[in-house]
């Protein structure tokens, strides 16, 4: 069973030891999205939602999620993050889709891909939570890693769809 990195000799879960790895600058950006109806879109851009500023709250949720990733992903190392940025862009060409990009960085011994993915997911979930009173039919779209840099495995950039 030793060919599995997160399973010990007894077949039980373990978190890998990264103490011998080099400290390098590591960055990851993840994408998620949520498609809403026109009324929700208008509430968000006009800042008229009864629960408050939807995008500011969602940004805070994404930041908190990145910082707490190791508490919800079992084999994820707790990291000292040095930067977290949540960015939004509306696509209103055929629907009302809010595209979310979460960028996380650190100087450390392991990457921040899971932190970026968790941040993007929590941001979309928070938009849903704050607007679900108007419509429960919103759709959270694909969540995926866009880029990562640093570390032994090198850089990654997702191919365009």
Curated annotation (Swiss-Prot):
Gene that produces this protein: moaC
MF-aspect GO terms: cyclic pyranopterin monophosphate synthase activity
Catalytic activity annotation: (8S)-3',8-cyclo-7,8-dihydroguanosine 5'-triphosphate = cyclic pyranopterin phosphate + diphosphate
Pathway(s) where this gene product acts: Cofactor biosynthesis; molybdopterin biosynthesis
Protein task: Catalyzes the conversion of (8S)-3',8-cyclo-7,8-dihydroguanosine 5'-triphosphate to cyclic pyranopterin monophosphate (cPMP).
Matching PANTHER family: CYCLIC PYRANOPTERIN MONOPHOSPHATE SYNTHASE, MOLYBDOPTERIN COFACTOR SYNTHESIS PROTEIN A
Top-level taxonomic group: Bacteria
Protein name in UniProt: Cyclic pyranopterin monophosphate synthase
Keyword Lyase: yes
Residues bound to substrate: 75-77, 114-115
UniProt organism field: Staphylococcus carnosus (strain TM300)
